[in-house]
Amino acid sequence: MSYMPAQNRTMSHNNQYNPPDLPPMVSAKEQTLMWQQNSYLGDSGIHSGAVTQVPSLSGKEDEEMEGDPLMFDLDTGFPQNFTQDQVDDMNQQLSQTRSQRVRAAMFPETLEEGIEIPSTQFDPQQPTAVQRLSEPSQMLKHAVVNLINYQDDAELATRAIPELIKLLNDEDQVVVSQAAMMVHQLSKKEASRHAIMNSPQMVAALVRAISNSNDLESTKAAVGTLHNLSHHRQGLLAIFKSGGIPALVKLLSSPVESVLFYAITTLHNLLLHQDGSKMAVRLAGGLQKMVTLLQRNNVKFLAIVTDCLQILAYGNQESKLIILASGGPNELVRIMRSYDYEKLLWTTSRVLKVLSVCSSNKPAIVDAGGMQALAMHLGNMSPRLVQNCLWTLRNLSDAATKVEGLEALLQSLVQVLGSTDVNVVTCAAGILSNLTCNNQRNKATVCQVGGVDALVRTIINAGDREEITEPAVCALRHLTSRHVDSELAQNAVRLNYGLSVIVKLLHPPSRWPLIKAVIGLIRNLALCPANHAPLREHGAIHHLVRLLMRAFQDTERQRSSIATTGSQQPSAYADGVRMEEIVEGTVGALHILARESHNRALIRQQSVIPIFVRLLFNEIENIQRVAAGVLCELAADKEGAEIIEQEGATGPLTDLLHSRNEGVATYAAAVLFRMSEDKPQDYKKRLSIELTNSLLREDNNIWANADLGMGPDLQVGSLQGASALILLLYIFSISPYRLFAGYDTLPIDSMQGLEISSPVGGGGATGNSGGVNSASAGSGAVVPPSGAPTSPYSMDMDVGEIDAGALNFDLDAMPTPPNDNNNLAAWYDTDC
């Protein structure tokens, strides 16, 4: 039974009475009488007035008293009155056990078993004063005990180390084994562990025991000791200086799991914290052994191994090549496919991320199925794992443009674009940009899973973050050209309110790489007639002309500088972008926009036709081609044709009829044809003769060995010069003379739909593939009859066999070319 002096108790009556402090020398009998006078026992309420309050009308207890945990009922604590003898006994018991209570609180281990000590604690949640004071004393006692034990351990180890070193060097393997196990036990205590690591002779003896002993138990004990030492920097240094790394690497071939664990964790600690360890592990052949260990199935063990590989491979090309030669990519991809332990997946993805920047490892990872394996974890709940997978996928994506079976990855990437993490969105946009480059299947897949809508929203939400907008714009540029759903994508950008945002990206402070991508996207969007008016209303033509003038001025200044100094300076660059690329891109976009009459009128008002004419003299054939193309569209209007002629375009256009670039020659012929519509018959006759002569010039050279400025993949043996002839014959074939039997005269209104790609080489501004192989032309491709000249442009042209003797042209009419935009310049579908 707990007892609490009256002075420390809280009464439950409304009229509380606290007696004055008792004199220090009052007998127990007098104290009892005073307690009785103070109504602590059997109070009737007459003397104290404790129950004289008016009872509640509701008959309920006071709400405040009802919920107060400190209130208590005296009748419960004292069910009956105590006699004087009982009170004396209680006082005597408390007095006699006071020292025992103090001892129990401060030194409980000194009490004898079976002794019951009365407690003075009334509330279990409130410790007594003695209990509160005992906490610091217990801490002090434990500190003293630990200090004594530490000192004992240190002294013991210091005295034992010399003898243990001798035993470790003994020739008897049994002695060595016993000594190694003893040292291992000592290393488990901090004091003796410090004594061991402070002894270079002891660490060296342990390393020798590992290297020379064939006994598994002694090896296990010795490497276990090194493992314990490796948790301290001083121990790591001692192991490194004693030549422990080669010995530990050797143990990576051990068949014993515990030895392997000790060895790999010790090496891991060395690689993390000890300078020089990386090179030592490489020289000892550790990389090869670690790659071999990847075949094991213990996930925690594999996590340590992969982390070691990441440390060794990071920033070291030689290590990456060693991992490749040892079959590392295949094993790492297997781990990503086979396990779900987050830490293992994270460490493995870190290794793959390091290897993915190596040009040699990149295709190996892709071939091993790395893209699909990494895609499996894009929905993982671990942000760090998802981030590593995305970075790795982005690094690999430029080598995976021809990989099939990426539908699940593409769908996941489209979903990831909705993330609020800037890094995640940046990676996803970059991966989509690379995987949709020149891959029609991936383009169609992304469009079908809502990729266009997601990319437009991404661009809108990105604001001025060019690390997001640039890859997103590039991805849209790819999706809007050269695949079955490209027209749907072109419309989807407009329907998702993306045109205004895209045009605004042409404004400052956008940098040139982003501007270049936007120009290509606008050019592709203009292929959809429904986009012509919105693009014009959002100011696309004005900004394209502004950029063209700026880039043209930069290139002209560069030309003048070269002419003045005579030096061969490189082309004008800005943020890594050649200004010639901007010239080509803007003129190409204006070329497509000029297919619409209102756009042609606006372009004429910009006073930019003189620049187009001057670009006909440019040494870069791609620029000549787009310049001739936009002039071809502008010449469809009488006003445009007159301005072109006034700017002196007839001369350069006539010269370009002799160009070895098929597109340039064809556009030049078309412009001259349109300019001649209002000319006298004599002028038309002279132009007809000029065209005939240009086609028949150096006939043998053209058909045998002429260099058309095309890449080897686009040249077809001795027939390489025939494509330009086919194009020109197509343009001028329909005449009263009916050079090709079976073709009816068609009304000609415009060149809309004619799209002539530039071939590779010949001074192309971008250096990208400019043509599309006929094998990939799609359903629009037409195979010429046997013996007829072939061309990469045959997919857009449907012509019969050519009568080589009928080479007369009548300039009264020109047919409308087929409206097929599959064969576009590759400048608009690259990731450059």
Curated annotation (Swiss-Prot):
PANTHER family on file: ARMADILLO SEGMENT POLARITY PROTEIN (PTHR45976)
Subcellular location per the Swiss-Prot or TrEMBL entry: Cytoplasm; Cell membrane; Cell junction, Adherens junction
Residue ranges, compositional bias (Low complexity): 771-789
Region Disordered, residue ranges: 765-792
SMART domains xrefs: ARM
Broad class of the protein's primary localization: cytoplasm
GO molecular function, one term: cadherin binding
An example Gene Ontology CC term for this record: plasma membrane
First and last residues of every ARM repeat: 149-188, 191-231, 233-272, 275-314, 359-397, 398-437, 440-481, 487-527, 597-636, 638-677
One Pfam assignment: Arm
Keywords from the named record: Cell adhesion, Cell junction, Cell membrane, Cytoplasm, Developmental protein, Membrane, Repeat, Segmentation polarity protein, Wnt signaling pathway
Job of this protein: May associate with CadN and participate in the transmission of developmental information. Can associate with alpha-catenin. Accumulates through wg signaling; arm function in wg signal transduction is required early in development for determination of neuroblast fate. Arm and Abl proteins function cooperatively at adherens junctions in both the CNS and epidermis.
GO biological process: anatomical structure morphogenesis; canonical Wnt signaling pathway; cell adhesion; neuroblast fate commitment; segment polarity determination
Topology of this chain in the membrane: Peripheral membrane protein
Name of the protein in its database record: Armadillo segment polarity protein
Gene this protein is translated from: arm
Family: Belongs to the beta-catenin family.
